[in-house]
């Protein structure tokens, strides 16, 4: 298949620049993957589509304030580091801007010296391995000095950091939010539990590769970035019991989906596991674990719209996206949601 098969017209004004005041007041498009039928709802109505005994799978990763803006020791020249992933205790793989300043051996300082950094390696892809020096706990230092790494298509400043976190975020490590989960409130999750639906958590730390465009024409040639995931025995057991009963496993977001499909065996069962995944799900792939999906509206030609098209059918998805544009749905991270049933 060709990348162009997943292109669609999107007016720029439909790209949501800020979250809605009430998380679950966003719109919800319900798409029947068998018939292609579309219904327009509010996100809170999702509960109507979840049945007793079903299991909802959420990604509890937490976005780090991973943008650090500082200066070069000696000259005061400006530098920006974006932390991508931890290599070992105080060494991180980072994007550096401007790259020419971040040579091996160069030292930088942040927050009037509260945090210092030295570039120890330049990788083939241009990323830097950076060692950090500080007093206390790194996460606390980062929390006080770092900024949220918002996606490149969001141009407005985020007033409240917590609006780019899910209400159940727990495990620090992401460079971007698992945005399908942003629509849930604590009250809605409690209502879902009260209806007899299981809620389980896994962790996948979202990397910046999620925003990288597909640069090859043929999907078969695209290589995904690797991301760290973790599924507990408790969550795995509940998912397996759900499959045995014939109930639905409903994945919240493409990140939860990619984790479940990485771990799942040919019978759709999962086990306690952690590791790195670079699974790329595109049409032709047969889902093993995930039956239904809650997701946002994605970028044209992105790996995310390809995953969604694999579950619901490309034609159904492209029709649904055309209708979403006509109905002026809000797109991308702070936008509206879709439920594929």
Swiss-Prot record:
- What Enzyme Commission number does this protein have? 2.4.99.17
Recorded GO MF terms: S-adenosylmethionine:tRNA ribosyltransferase-isomerase activity
Cystine residue pairs: none
Q: What is its main location?
A: cytoplasm
**Top class in the EC scheme:** transferase
Q: Which UniProt keywords apply?
A: Cytoplasm, Queuosine biosynthesis, S-adenosyl-L-methionine, Transferase
Q: What Pfam families does the annotation carry?
A: Queuosine_synth (PF02547)
Which reaction is the catalytic activity of this chain? 7-aminomethyl-7-carbaguanosine(34) in tRNA + S-adenosyl-L-methionine = epoxyqueuosine(34) in tRNA + adenine + L-methionine + 2 H(+)
Q: In which pathway does it act?
A: tRNA modification; tRNA-queuosine biosynthesis
Question: Where is this protein found?
Answer: Cytoplasm
- Any one cellular component term from GO for this entry? cytoplasm
Q: Which InterPro entries match?
A: QueA, QueA_dom1, QueA_dom2, QueA_sf
Q: Which GO terms describe its biological process?
A: queuosine biosynthetic process; tRNA wobble guanine modification
What domain of life does the native source organism fall in? Bacteria
Question: Where does the signal sequence lie?
Answer: none
Asked whether the UniProt record includes Transferase among its keywords, one would answer: yes
Function in brief: Transfers and isomerizes the ribose moiety from AdoMet to the 7-aminomethyl group of 7-deazaguanine (preQ1-tRNA) to give epoxyqueuosine (oQ-tRNA).
Quaternary organization: Monomer.
Family, as annotated: Belongs to the QueA family.
Q: Which PANTHER family match?
A: S-ADENOSYLMETHIONINE:TRNA RIBOSYLTRANSFERASE-ISOMERASE (PTHR30307:SF0)
**What is this protein's name?**
S-adenosylmethionine:tRNA ribosyltransferase-isomerase
Q: Which organism is it from?
A: Clostridium beijerinckii (strain ATCC 51743 / NCIMB 8052)
């Amino acid at each position: 298949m060709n990348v162009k098969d997943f292109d669609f017209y999107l007016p720029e004004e439909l790209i949501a620049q800020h979250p809605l005041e009430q998380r679950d007041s966003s719109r919800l498009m319900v798409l029947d993957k068998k018939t292609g039928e579309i219904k327009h709802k509010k996100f809170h109505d999702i509960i109507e589509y979840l049945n007793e005994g079903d299991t909802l799978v959420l990604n509890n990763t937490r976005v780090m304030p991973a943008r650090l803006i500082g200066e070069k020791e000696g000259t005061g020249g400006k530098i920006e580091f974006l932390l991508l992933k931890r290599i070992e205790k105080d060494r991180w793989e980072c994007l550096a801007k401007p790259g020419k300043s971040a040579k091996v051996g160069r030292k930088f300082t942040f927050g009037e010296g509260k945090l210092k950094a030295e570039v120890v390696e330049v990788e083939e892809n241009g990323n830097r391995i950076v060692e950090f020096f500080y007093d206390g706990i790194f996460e606390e230092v980062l929390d006080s000095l770092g900024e949220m790494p918002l996606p490149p298509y969001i141009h407005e400043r985020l007033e409240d950091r917590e609006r780019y976190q899910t209400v159940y975020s727990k495990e620090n490590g992401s460079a971007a939010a698992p945005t399908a989960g942003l629509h849930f409130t604590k009250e809605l999750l409690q209502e879902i539990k009260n209806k007899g639906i299981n809620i389980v958590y896994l962790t996948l730390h979202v990397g910046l590769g999620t925003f990288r465009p597909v640069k090859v024409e043929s999907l078969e040639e695209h290589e995904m970035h690797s991301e760290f995931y973790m599924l507990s025995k408790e969550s795995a057991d509940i998912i397996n019991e759900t499959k045995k009963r014939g109930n639905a496993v409903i994945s919240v977001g493409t990140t939860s989906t990619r984790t479940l499909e990485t771990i799942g065996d040919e019978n759709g069962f999962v086990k306690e596991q952690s590791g790195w995944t670079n699974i790329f799900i595109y049409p032709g792939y047969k889902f093993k674990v995930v039956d239904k999906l809650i997701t946002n509206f994605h970028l044209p030609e992105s790996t995310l719209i390809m995953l969604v098209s694999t579950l619901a059918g490309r034609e159904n998805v492209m029709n649904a996206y055309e209708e979403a544009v006509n109905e002026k749905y809000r797109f991308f991270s702070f936008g509206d949601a879709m439920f594929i049933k």
